[in-house]
Amino acid sequence: MTFYGYRRPDGRVGVRNRVLILPASVCATDTARIIAQQVEGAISFNNQQGCSQVAPDQQFTMDVMAGYAANPNIYGTVVVSLGCENCQMDLVVKAIEERTNKPLKRVIIQEVGGTLKAVEIAVRYAKEMVAEASMLQKEEFPLSELIVGTECGGSDPTSGLAANPAIGAMSDLVVQAGGTSILSETSEFIGAEHILARRAINKEVHDRIYEITSRFEAHFHAVGEDVRQGNPSPGNKAGGITTLEEKSLGCIHKGGHSPINAVYDYAKQVESKQGLVIMDTPGNDPASVAAMVAGGAQVIVFSSGRGSPVGHPIAPVVKVTGNKITFANMEDNIDFCAAPLIYGEKTVEQLGTDLLNMVVETACGKQTKAEALGFVETAIARVCNYV
C-alpha cells in the first residue's frame, strides 16, 4: 500500500503542504493570526506560552515550536516574535534549524516598527513560500514513510472495547508495512504499565516505560495532588468508566500487539521506520496531540466514545468512535465508526484494515471532519502536567 505526499529537503514526507506562521510567544500570537488570515495556504496557532516560564516548561515550548516547523506537513515557516520574550528569536531559529533545513524566515515586531509593519513583511514572506510550495508535485511513497500518532479523549467503555482495538489493529498494519506508530498519554498507562513493559524490545525500553509512569505520578505528588482526582474525567465516569486503571487498560489497546521499540520524551523528534514507539505525553488531548505532531506525526488517529471535535492546525485528525449513538449524534465530527465490532458485524482485523484505508485516503489529501470545520486546537504541556 502507498500514499501520495511531498518530499521535503530533510528527507521526510509530508501529507499536507502548508506554510506555518509561528508565534514565538503569546505576545506574537494575534499578529501571527492576522498574517495567516491574509495568506491562503498559511496556517497559525494560538501559542499561550513562550515567556515567563520555568526552564523545563520553556523547553517543552521550544520543542513544540521547533517540531511544528520541522513537521513534514509544513513547507516552510515564518517565525514571528515580539522581541523581548524568553523564547528569543535566535533560540527559536536555532532549535528549528537543528531539526530541519526547510525554508525559514523571521520577523521581530519590536524591531520592524509594530504590528502593521510586521504583518506587511511577514505576509510577503508567506506569499513567496506559498508560491514555491504550489510548484511541488505529489509523489508516491510506501507506508514506511508514515508516522501515525494515536490518541483517545472523551472515552467511554466502547473506546476500550471497539475504537481503541480498531486503532491498534491499524497501528499493527502500519508497523508491518515498515512505518511508525506513536502510543501516547502516559497518565493512561498507570495501572497497565506492566502490560506495556512486557512488550518492550529491550531492558532500556522496559525501564523507561516504568520511569515515565512513575515520574508522571511524582509530578502530582510534589504538589499534594493525585492524578486519580482528575482522571477519569466527569465525562468518562458519566459514560461508564469507573477507575483510572480501567481507562488505562482501554487506552493501551491503541498500540495493538507490536513490540515497543523506543520511548520518546515530550515533543522530541521521532525517527521514521521505527515501528511502535511511546511518547511521554499527558492525557490532555490538545497537549498530547501537539507533542506527537511536534515529533513528526503526519496524521493523528483519535478515538472518542463520548465524542470530541478536537483538530490540529498542522496534522489531519481522523476521529474514531466505538459508540454508534455518538456516531449518530456527532456525525459532523466523527470520521469512522468502530461499533460493528461490538455487534459482531466485523472483526477487529477488518476494522483495522478499513481504518488504515481511511488513514491512507487522508494522507493522500482527503479532508477529515475536523479539517473541514477548521478546528486547530493546540496546547503545550507543563512540568506539573495535565491529567
Predicted stretch roles:
Residues 1-151, 155-299, 303-387:
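Metallocofactor- and cofactor-centric catalytic cores in central/energy metabolism, strongly enriched
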